[in-house]
């Protein structure tokens, strides 16, 4: 009973002209008197199914991935329960904060992917034509595959600060390294953003690139300096 409702109002919502982000773009166009097609375009697509068993398997796979997303907080909680007994009190505090932040950041990434990145990508790719004689017909499989990939990739991309912090604990990444190669990181971030959103317009590129860059800066802030780590180790050794 729930899946048809979720498909119509959540998964397939970006197909419809009244999707919240499309309404927002048109509102911005009206307020600032912008006549560019990017802000005024009316958008509506109808998906087709060309595989007999596709609806059944897509039903199962979509339910699975939605379960993965909604179960993320519980997964992080179980990870915390597993590692916490082996940690010192000050380490537990840091890991607890990191896992809490990781959960929040994952959902922020998923929401950004769902409400902004995927709708913009869908609108561009579904209306892009090699020739006027070629009619675009979007299959259900193609839609779902791209939907899941982009939304989940954005969620995972927002885990960058947590991953970087964990790598720093293992001694594989240092704050000085990230600062030194910041310019290189900016170039890589722009390239990744361009791949994720092949729309070609600067607005969409900025929407993706800016959060990714902020995540990079957050990663730097989360890593402690070597001197601070050494001081804490000396204090902990004295307390023991």
Predicted segments, located by residue:
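Membrane topogenic/interface segments and analogous intrinsically disordered interaction regions
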Residues: 1-240
């Amino acid at each position: 009973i729930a899946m048809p409702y979720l498909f119509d109002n959540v998964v397939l919502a970006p197909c419809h002209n009244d999707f919240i982000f499309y309404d927002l773009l048109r509102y911005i166009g009206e307020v600032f008197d912008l006549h560019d097609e990017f802000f005024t375009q009316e958008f509506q697509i109808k998906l087709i199914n060309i595989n007999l068993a596709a609806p059944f398997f897509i039903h199962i796979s979509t339910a699975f991935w939605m379960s993965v997303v909604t179960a993320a907080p519980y997964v992080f909680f179980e990870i915390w329960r597993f590692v916490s007994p082996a940690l010192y009190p000050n380490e537990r505090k840091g890991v607890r904060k990191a896992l809490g932040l990781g959960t929040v950041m994952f959902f922020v990434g998923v929401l950004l992917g769902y409400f902004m990145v995927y709708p913009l990508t869908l609108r561009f790719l579904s209306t892009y034509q090699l020739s006027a004689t070629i009619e675009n017909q979007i299959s259900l499989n193609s839609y779902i595959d791209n939907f899941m990939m982009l939304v989940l990739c954005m969620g995972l991309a927002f885990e960058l600060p947590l991953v970087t912090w964990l790598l720093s604990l293992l001694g594989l990444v240092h704050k000085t390294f990230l600062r030194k190669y910041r310019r290189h990181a900016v170039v890589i971030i722009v390239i990744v953003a361009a791949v994720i959103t092949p729309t070609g317009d600067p607005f969409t590129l900025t929407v993706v690139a800016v959060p990714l860059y902020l995540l990079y800066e957050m990663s730097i802030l989360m890593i402690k300096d070597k001197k601070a780590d050494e001081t804490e180790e000396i204090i902990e050794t004295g307390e023991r």
